[in-house]
A protein has these predicted regions:
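Juxtamembrane boundary at the C-terminal end of a transmembrane helix
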Residues: 218-228
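Alpha-helical membrane segments and immediately flanking helix-loop junctions
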Residues: 120-147, 151-155, 173-211
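Helical membrane-embedded segments and adjacent short helical loop/helix-boundary regions
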Residues: 2-13, 17-79, 84-95, 99
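Transmembrane alpha-helices that form the ion-translocation and gating core
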Residues: 94-134, 155-172
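Structural signature of hydrophobic alpha-helical transmembrane segments
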Residues: 1-13, 57-72, 117-126, 146-154, ...
Length: 228
């Protein structure tokens, strides 16, 4: 019984994403970005067919497994654009450090101003790393792993929805700058959006995602000790 459910789950998810890509291409908007638009489609499909979330989990596990080869595949555009990346390494590293630290400190300060609990402050501060890293980092900074993972997912989705739109609004067209911003702030989802924009954007976003996670993991505990 599991195999048909897995095939159905993967098919529905892939179909919802492809449909969302078509809608986003014809009607570009922050609300038609594939990740945001496809999520309710999958939920509606599960509700309509009466499939429980527990039954959908094996299909989700298959797609999560495929993230591994997809991540390794980022090495291809990275290799093709290696010379450009090396030539712009210094300003890119400066921008990455500024983006990672500013989003960490700004999120923590805002959460503290709203009188949120220290656990929530710590969890929201590390929102711009990937979910697996956030889950491991949360206990170190006295945050909640479940909350941290939720904030990571929300950050990625909001970044993909609003990031390209805001960059277009303020006239940021340079592929390197766009990829750096998406990868630093919106991690995996931002990298997927960057790959959709272009090969160079995807290569830069992939590097930015990894380095931002390392920097946040190293600097996060110290920065939060100053805020909390």
């Amino acid at each position: 019984m599991k195999l048909p459910l897995i095939i159905f789950g993967v098919g529905v998810t892939s179909g919802a994403y492809l449909l969302s890509r078509i809608v986003a291409k014809r009607h570009p908007s922050p609300f038609t970005t594939p990740v945001f638009f496809s999520t309710p489609l999958v939920i509606l499909a599960l509700l309509a067919t009466g499939i429980r979330l527990e039954d959908y989990k094996p299909a989700k596990d298959v797609m999560v497994f495929l993230l591994g080869p997809a991540t390794v595949a980022l090495a291809v555009p990275l290799h093709k654009n290696w010379r450009t990346l090396v030539e712009n390494a210094l300003p890119a590293l400066f921008g990455l450090a500024a983006g990672s630290l500013s989003t960490l400190i700004a999120a923590a300060c805002l959460a503290k101003l709203l009188a949120l609990s220290p656990a929530v402050v710590a969890s929201i501060a590390i929102k711009s790393v990937t979910a697996p890293i956030a889950i491991e980092l949360a206990p170190i900074v006295h945050g909640d792993p479940t909350l941290a993972a939720g904030f990571v997912i929300a950050t990625g989705m909001i970044g993909v929805m609003l990031g390209p739109w805001l960059m277009n609004l303020v006239g940021i067209r340079a592929p390197l700058a766009r990829g750096l911003a998406l990868g630093t702030i919106s991690h995996g989802q931002g990298t997927a959006q960057a790959i959709h924009e272009g090969e160079l954007q995807g290569a830069v976003a992939g590097i930015a995602m990894g380095l931002a996670a390392v920097l946040t993991s190293l600097a996060g505990p110290f920065a939060l000790s100053l805020v909390l």
